[in-house]
């Protein structure tokens, strides 16, 4: 009997181990309902905030244009009013950011990435009003900025706000709701739910903790924010470019060349953004008055351009359908591209509350259209359509700059409803991303976050030195 005991205990121990393993697997798959419910709340609030922000920007732009109509008979007065209206709105946005919440300046996406890494604080009680109303000022003034930056940062901060209000505990809940809000913000900004999900998974892949809980929460938040957007807006593509023709297989090599062009330009564009940040910082030197006046001058310039050359100002959504339809000459496309590169650098690098997604989409469209027009002339036997290159190029600069090709491809497809162009878009985006990686340089948001963290560390070191010096005295 004694010799049989070990043989009987071994199967029992094995069964216990199997039961324990199965129990662990089942428990790991149990998603706390509280987090999923909070994700739905976050998505709903983010969607409503994004709709309010979008409507507010549109209202301000209409009011600004209405003021110009009353001075149409007096050209010098018209230019003066165009400059002053945009300058005042821009200065309002710069003032709010500099005075009350410096972390609300710029895109805001690097701030969310830093918060997901526990390296940046989330002060939602001050960021939410400053980013919302400051963004209304800068975007309503016609500056070359996108609304996705504000909605992503607003979304992330709403996620943290809900966490604090309902007093949810745990690092996983904090991280999940922060990511959910950011994804919901991008989805609501562009009416692109799948792009919002991919944005978190791809662009924020170093920071996003991919778990069953987090991905379910992100899905729920994105669904709710998109529903809120579509309740108040039409359920159609955000940018109406019509149905374009497909790209024949024997023309796909042209899209690879287009991707190579963007792969060269993307890292250069990133260096220009960072260089312009340094230049403008030397101009204002951290002085709040100089910074606000500089912002007013940039905003006023965009206001003038909005009247003289409308295609060179604003986020660029109105420009994209016109360029895709081939309504610009080659010379005009070159002028628009150069002008918008300059205005994008000035507006975004100055620290104005606003994103860079939309301006980069517009730049990619213009450059893609120009390339398409050249290809049409050089290869008439292919019966090409320049608009297909415009759509392919639309997300290519985004892919080369922030190194998120999937997000760029899906975002453009959802915004334009031209899914038949997915293959040329993949080729263009992949070519742009690979070459951008080979040429070196960090993705834009990563580079901006690294600068922010370096500045934060320097400020903390300076405060500690000052504190130690005061103790010694």
Curated annotation (Swiss-Prot):
Intramembrane region(s): 109-116, 177-189, 193-201, 387-401, 402-404, 405-416, 417-421
Pfam families: Voltage_CLC
Superkingdom per UniProt: Bacteria
Short sequence motif named Selectivity filter part_3, residue ranges: 355-359
NCBIfam families the UniProt entry points to: PRK05277.1
Name of this chain's protein: H(+)/Cl(-) exchange transporter ClcA
Gene name for this UniProt entry: clcA
UniProt keyword Transmembrane present: yes
Periplasmic topological segments: 70-76, 233-252, 310-329, 377-386
Lineage: Bacteria, Pseudomonadati, Pseudomonadota, Gammaproteobacteria, Enterobacterales
Listed SUPFAM superfamilies: Clc chloride channel
Single GO MF descriptor: antiporter activity
Record site: Mediates proton transfer from the outer aqueous phase to the interior of the protein: 148
